[in-house]
Amino acid sequence: MAKIKMEKQKDLQNELLNTISELLDDSNINSVLILVRKTARFLIGNNLNTGENKRLNINEFIFENNLYHSFFSGIMGYFTLLDQLGCIFYAKQPIRNVLKKYSGIPKKEQEVLVGLRNCLAHNYGLANKYYNFSLVDNNENERRVVELAKTKKIQGDYSNKDDYYTSIYIHNFTSLVEDIFHKIKEDFSNNKLKPVIKNVSELRARFTIKQ
């Protein structure tokens, strides 16, 4: 019985590693983690194979092509990737736990990213009762992911005050998510992470799709 359980666990480990690594045996089955990562890269304008920033001038590109919807979708795609990784390895608060362990940024800034994720997911916008967000196309010398607002927003105050705006440096954010993906993959490969997924059937049903 113990041997069978160990074999099933090994099968799950191998299948999950393949799902993360895009090494699925069946060419008609796609990993949704890989799909959402490639889609997010495309919509943001990052290199499809590496995720490296192409250094587009985001604001100019968006205004010229009226592509706010695509740009927001790309950012949301990166948040979805964090959600997916969190759901595989954490039973509760998946995205918060992923950011807590792997982001390397302060807790307050982690909560800001969760707030932006919720804004985009629920309203497809950049404000809620806690935050007003500004998306910044950072230059190569900027290392921050989040710049906190100068003044804490009064809950429910939707007035357009400059001091209320919290800035998200988009290129640094996408680089952060790419880095988190690689760190989680490495930790899992080295048996430092255990999935909360129960079996291969659940993994395939939730995190792969057929063409």
Model-derived segments and their meaning:
Residues 104-211:
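Acidic, Ser/Thr/Gly/Pro-rich intrinsically disordered interaction regions
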Residues 2-50:
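Surface/interface-facing alpha-helical segments and adjacent flexible terminal/loop regions used
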Residues 3, 61-68, 156, 160-163:
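A near-ubiquitous, low-amplitude feature marking generic local secondary-structure context
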Residues 8-16, 24-28, 73-76, 90-97, ...:
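Anionic, Ser/Thr-rich low-complexity intrinsically disordered regions
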Residues 34-38, 42-101:
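Short, contiguous, well-structured surface segments enriched in hydrophobic/aromatic residues
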Residues 10, 22, 64-80, 102-111, ...:
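Short, charged/polar micro-motifs that form catalytic or ligand-binding hotspots
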